[in-house]
Amino acid sequence: MIPIMRIPFLNKLNKRKIVSVVRLNGLIASGARGGISDSALAPIFEKAFRKGNPSAVAFIINSPGGSPVQSSLVGDRIKRLSEETEVPTIAFVEDVAASGGYWIASAANEIYADHASIIGSIGVISSGFGLQELLARYGVERRVYTAGKSKSMLDPFKKEKAEDVKRLKGILSQLHEVFINHVNGARAGKLSTEHDLFTGEIWLAAQAKELGLIDGIGHFVPVLKERFGEKTRFKEYSQKKSLSQRFGVSIAKDAISLVEEK
């Protein structure tokens, strides 16, 4: 039997660095199959960090945000697994990492983006409609019965109350403070102190870099090959799509192709 270490091909293979790649696309929401949620991503993250002895885990992010809770859970999982496995993490922003998308990106050790990437929106929003006049116009009476004076707070079919709005703004302020504390902790020593970064404003990559919100401008393959070598292997881990999802994507692609041909 030939000892494994004496086989030239295997020796070369063993020297090649492996980088795990996880794509995070879409809205951040609980149970979002194919989107971004902690429960859906947990097994994928486990494989990305623990299989194949990776030199790093790269997260390719394209998200406008979503649930603050899911953003926090996903971000904390990234940091926790990185600490447990001692595997560094690098986020690469494609079109956008805004709001919850940036929350997750900032959980990585480093953040890179394209020149045209949109970064930031570090804020919290709640929106809705007031439809009480529409009901009155059509002579519709809505009947609601509750136990607990705040149970129907901000009902869109009732005129809003000042105390309800005050309560909601207080909740939003608390969530905003949690977001701010996360970013300050994750980007400690990197953030600009000359600009208010937490107004919900967005920036392109060049200014985001000046403000310390990202570490550099670059794409994931060139950046990682420069760091780990030209022979670096990329192993992508992704969610398995259901048959209906794959079928739906196929139909959409065929429809687009048909329109383009016409």
Give the positions of each predicted feature.
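N-terminal organellar transit peptides
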Residues: 1-114, 125-262
